[in-house]
Amino acid sequence: MLQISHLYADYGGKPALEDINLTLESGELLVVLGPSGCGKTTLLNLIAGFVPYQHGSIQLAGKRIEGPGAERGVVFQNEGLLPWRNVQDNVAFGLQLAGIEKMQRLEIAHQMLKKVGLEGAEKRYIWQLSGGQRQRVGIARALAANPQLLLLDEPFGALDAFTRDQMQTLLLKLWQETGKQVLLITHDIEEAVFMATELVLLSSGPGRVLERLPLNFARRFVAGESSRSIKSDPQFIAMREYVLSRVFEQREAFS
């Protein structure tokens, strides 16, 4: 379980997050949404251990987070892939740094690529891939170390609408298959409502938790209902419009 208690953090010398209290249980998909500048990415960077926080605590499985660790896998919008390495070697890179034997890490990379639908693309280079394929590689790399927690920072923001829909459904299938804790940062309201088992709305900066909404649309999808059916459901549309109104309230307050 991820547990965040009374978290305060600065960014660029200014308060970015204020008294954040959150929990994320195993098998849950928590989505954090809010207006630009609300501290969404700062929150992810704190959980990843990339930056320090000023007050409070972040614990994963009862252990305080004070730096990066293999128990947390991170996927970024810009993927962060190595262009001079092929797809398989990119996925296996973290395992190589961890000292995993070559044949074992290549087999793990092969299995992860199979999970994300890129079996057969092992020897291709990053520049030969589409945006959606590069994000699949990024997800495969994050899963390769078998982390307890998967962190994703607006991973589908630069993709076209069709590819974004494909990646959303892929992530939900991987979430169901692996049972991992997942925390997703997004600025896309429809994506947030569709994918969250719990949606956290942050205020304008410094970010505070405005509201926590338990949702069941992601579970309906993994139970077999189509994404198109879910997104055209009046319940989904009503929730999307409610969340949109809450985000607009914060944008207007900030301006």
Swiss-Prot record:
Matching NCBIfam families: PRK11248.1
Inducing stimuli: Regulated by CysB in response to sulfate starvation.
Signal peptide feature range: none
InterPro entries: AAA+_ATPase, ABC_transporter-like_ATP-bd, ABC_transporter-like_CS, ABC_transporter_ATP-bind, P-loop_NTPase
Record's subcellular location: Cell inner membrane
Residues annotated as binding ATP: G34, P35, S36, G37, C38, G39, K40, T41
Domain ABC transporter positions: 2-229
Keyword annotations from UniProtKB, A to Z: ATP-binding, Cell inner membrane, Cell membrane, Membrane, Nucleotide-binding, Translocase, Transport
EC nos: 7.6.2.7
Gene this chain is encoded by: tauB
Gene Ontology terms describing biological process: cellular response to sulfur starvation; taurine transmembrane transport
Transmembrane segments: none
SMART domains assigned: AAA
Main location: membrane
Catalytic activity of the protein: taurine(out) + ATP + H2O = taurine(in) + ADP + phosphate + H(+)
Gene Ontology MF annotations: ABC-type taurine transporter transporter activity; ATP binding; ATP hydrolysis activity
Disulfide bonds: none
Membrane topology: Peripheral membrane protein
Quaternary context: The complex is composed of two ATP-binding proteins (TauB), two transmembrane proteins (TauC) and a solute-binding protein (TauA).
PANTHER family: TAURINE IMPORT ATP-BINDING PROTEIN TAUB, TAURINE IMPORT ATP-BINDING PROTEIN-RELATED
Annotated protein name in UniProt: Taurine import ATP-binding protein TauB
Protein family per UniProt: Belongs to the ABC transporter superfamily. Taurine importer (TC 3.A.1.17.1) family.
UniProt GO cellular component terms: ATP-binding cassette (ABC) transporter complex, substrate-binding subunit-containing; membrane
Role according to the record: Part of the ABC transporter complex TauABC involved in taurine import. Responsible for energy coupling to the transport system.
